[in-house]
Curated annotation (Swiss-Prot):
Its main location: membrane. The keyword RNA-binding does not apply. Exhibits both phospholipase A1/2 and acyltransferase activities. Shows phospholipase A1 (PLA1) and A2 (PLA2) activity, catalyzing the calcium-independent release of fatty acids from the sn-1 or sn-2 position of glycerophospholipids. Shows O-acyltransferase activity, catalyzing the transfer of a fatty acyl group from glycerophospholipid to the hydroxyl group of lysophospholipid. The gene is plaat1. Disruption phenotype: Knockout animals exhibit normal growth of their body and eye lens. However, the disappearance of mitochondria and the endoplasmic reticulum in the lens is almost completely suppressed and membranous structures persisted in the lens central region. PROSITE patterns: LRAT (PS51934). This is Phospholipase A and acyltransferase 1. Its EC number is 2.3.1.-, 3.1.1.32, 3.1.1.4. Residues 171-179 are lumenal.
Length: 179
């Protein structure tokens, strides 16, 4: 069964975002892990192992879902057991970009991933996060819906702040007129 069919079957069976994944991931699958304040992403390698980004100072044990990982500027590429990274959180297989991006051959995905294990990489929540990392491995292009949502929220707040500043400036000028 291909990834698109497995994803469709999961949705048809009523699997929701916060249920523990009941099917076995296949090498090359994207794994979405639901942390309390964000989603962490990993790529399944096989035999229970994933590759993911962890903050440089977090060490091997990453079951702790620290928010500091979101604000870290550097990350290390680690190969870890999926069950240890997930801990008490929930996860699902989520190859959501397969409709728009063609996955690379599984052997190439795994080879590219294994070459990066142990390397330190730059991390940026908006431009180079864990979702960008795993989608770059799977598709050859880094994509992050989570980053796009964050950029949209920041843009909205900035636009609102600008509008209030302009309105405040207009209001102040109209009160200071002598006539």
């Amino acid at each position: 069964m291909d990834n698109q069919q497995r994803r469709t079957d999961n949705m048809a069976s009523g699997e929701t975002d916060h249920l523990q994944c009941v099917e076995e991931p296949q090498p090359g699958d994207l794994i979405e892990i639901f942390r309390p304040a964000y989603q962490h992403w990993a790529l399944y390698l096989g035999d229970g192992y994933i590759i993911n980004l962890t903050p440089v100072d977090e060490g091997q044990a990453t079951a702790v879902s620290s928010v500091k990982s979101v604000f870290s500027r550097k990350a290390v590429v680690r190969m870890q057991l999926l069950k240890e990274v997930v801990g008490a959180d929930s996860y699902r297989i989520n190859n959501k970009y397969d409709d728009d991006h063609t996955p690379l051959p599984v052997s190439e995905i795994i080879q590219r991933a294994q070459m990066l294990i142990g390397q330190e990489v730059s991390y940026d929540l908006l431009g180079s996060n864990c979702e960008h990392f795993v989608t770059l491995l799977r598709y050859g292009e880094g994509v992050s819906e989570q980053a796009s949502r964050a950029i949209g929220a920041i843009s909205l707040v900035t636009a609102a702040a600008s509008a209030f500043s302009v309105l405040g400036l207009i209001n102040t000028r109209s009160r200071n007129r002598p006539f």
